[in-house]
UniProtKB/Swiss-Prot annotation:
The keyword Protein biosynthesis does not apply. This is Histidinol-phosphate aminotransferase. Its cofactor is pyridoxal 5'-phosphate. The lineage of its organism: Bacteria, Bacillati, Bacillota, Bacilli, Lactobacillales. Pfam families: Aminotran_1_2 (PF00155). One of its GO terms (molecular function) is pyridoxal phosphate binding.
Length: 357
């Protein structure tokens, strides 16, 4: 077994809602720890999945996810042959790391950010350089990343909006960074939460046509509400496209995933309705935090990163009141996803109580 794998700890997933409710004697639990959509997917998703014929169960699915590929390409105005599909963006993170990294190479990431980037680098026997975000506003320090590059640097990862901070980097700032980044270094912009952004030019996807070292990742797990179905995609040019197609499993999406994912992508009216709900609730909750003098980073995602002091104590107090949040990422900061308007209203009261305000 690889020494780098021996050093890893298994991911601690959220317990089932009913298990947590039973443990704490709760009538209602708002699960706000995994950045899921409380509104779920378009009703057309279930219709599409149910419409899949039982006759296909004995046959492998479409290995190119043709129907989904065409829908995603049209939505994003990209070449269908620039799309690689995976079981969520997680699979694509794993594959990109496998394709790009050699033992002894390194990646550069902001700190904090999504933990899987560093984990997969470790598996591939690469090291990770962590560059602190701006302490005042959470923005990525692109100049410090450029200064950290050496002859072993192979990848830079930018989650945009960032997870767990929710902070958004403009397309112009990323383009300036790309223009300074050596062409042999792959920049991956993980846009898992880009659907929630209410700023113009929310995506760098159009830049893929200009830069062969740029990859954009997307998922249907968040705004589209398909976390259980596991569908993600990457936008990239050759040679990365061909390499990713070569290493991915040949039938990595089932017919159910393809059908459900396609239905979700085609129902943009449902998506936008729910995104607007999240944007309204996000602003209301950030106004509440400002009014009560909490430090937080301005979010463009469906969650907020808040400084609370003793994170574990606050998280436990919230859980006892029926709100499951993510208190595992930082000893002083907590990440709370937005729930329904009703849950968010109750959460404000619970949050004041949990933080002794």
């Amino acid at each position: 077994m690889k020494k780098t794998v021996k050093a890893l700890a298994a991911y601690q997933a959220e317990l089932p809602v009913e298990t947590v409710k039973a443990k704490y004697g709760l009538q209602h639990l708002a699960r706000l720890s995994a950045n899921e959509s409380v509104y779920g997917p378009s009703p057309k998703v279930a219709q599409a999945v149910r419409a899949v014929s039982d006759d296909i169960l004995g046959y492998y699915p479409d290995g190119q996810a043709t129907e989904l590929r065409e829908a995603v390409a049209k939505l994003n105005h990209v070449d269908p042959q620039h799309l690689v599909f995976g079981a969520g963006a997680d699979e694509l993170i794993e594959l990109l790391t496998r394709v790009v990294l050699e033992p002894g190479s390194n990646i550069i990431i902001p700190n904090p950010t999504f933990g899987e980037y560093a984990m997969h680098a470790q598996i591939e026997q690469s090291t990770t350089k962590k560059i602190p975000v701006n302490v005042d506003n959470g923005n990525v320090d692109f100049d410090a990343i450029l200064d950290a590059i050496d002859d072993k640097t192979a990848m830079v990862w930018i989650a945009n909006p960032n997870n767990p901070t929710g902070v958004f980097e403009t397309t112009s700032s990323i383009k300036r960074f790309l223009d300074k980044l050596p062409a042999n270094i792959t920049l991956v912009v993980d846009e898992a939460y880009y659907d929630f952004v209410d700023e113009p030019d929310a995506t760098v996807a159009p830049l893929v046509a200009e830069y062969t070292n740029l990859v954009v990742l997307r998922t249907l797990s968040k705004a589209y509400g398909l976390a259980n179905l596991r569908v993600g995609y990457g936008i990239m040019q050759d040679p990365l496209y061909s390499a990713m197609q070569a290493v991915r499993l040949p039938y990595n999406l089932s017919t159910y995933q393809i059908a459900g994912g396609t239905a979700a992508v085609l129902d943009q009216e449902y998506l936008q309705k729910n995104v607007q709900r999240f944007q309204v609730e996000r602003q209301k909750f950030q106004d509440f935090l400002t009014k009560n003098k909490f430090k937080f980073y301005e979010s463009q995602a469906n969650f907020i990163w808040i400084k609370v002091g003793e994170t574990k104590k606050v998280g436990q107090k919230l859980l006892e009141q029926g709100f499951q949040v993510n208190d595992r990422l930082n000893p002083e900061w907590i990440r709370i996803a937005l729930g329904t308007p009703e849950d968010n209203a109750e959460l404000k009261l619970a949050f004041l109580k949990a933080t002794n305000k």
